[in-house]
């Protein structure tokens, strides 16, 4: 299955600023015609995180779907983004009150970099063996390390 889409129209539509690549629902979309191995490893780490979050959300979602409402099944593909968003928001509030410099987008950048998902991907993107050596749920170890 093709998971990297180069020169993606969707990537060009949704990405802004210096961002050129995104992992979206398990697919890697990029504005570029080719990616470095470092960027591919970074985005593949996000792919693994996404599928692990789907696994975590699957059991409660299926149970709630049978006993409450089938709408709970939407939690499975959205859990990664919900977790990412909540984590980013908490980090944003933290950095609003603790950073010396608030203007110029620094708070948002600091909140983005403080994400457990981003920390794992960024710290291991230069290791060519990381994806083979990586343990399930490795991103969980980065919580609380702002």
Outline where the language-model segments fall.
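Glycine-rich loops and low-complexity Gly/Arg-rich segments
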Residues: 29-32, 53-57, 64-65
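Short, solvent-exposed loop/turn segments at secondary-structure junctions
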Residues: 10-11, 35, 55
């Amino acid at each position: 299955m093709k998971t990297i889409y180069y020169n993606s129209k969707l990537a060009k539509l949704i990405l802004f600023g210096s961002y050129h690549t995104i992992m979206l629902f398990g697919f890697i979309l990029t504005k570029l015609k080719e990616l470095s191995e470092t960027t591919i490893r970074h985005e593949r780490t996000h792919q693994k995180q996404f599928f692990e979050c789907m696994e975590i959300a699957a059991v409660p979602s299926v149970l709630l779907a049978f006993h409450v409402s089938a709408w709970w099944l939407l939690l499975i593909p959205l859990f990664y983004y919900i977790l990412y968003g909540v984590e980013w928001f908490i980090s944003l509030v933290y950095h609003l009150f603790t950073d010396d410099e608030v203007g110029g987008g620094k708070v948002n950048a600091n909140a983005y970099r403080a994400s457990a998902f981003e920390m794992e991907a960024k710290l291991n993107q230069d290791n060519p063996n990381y994806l083979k050596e990586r343990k399930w749920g490795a991103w969980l170890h980065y919580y609380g390390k702002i």
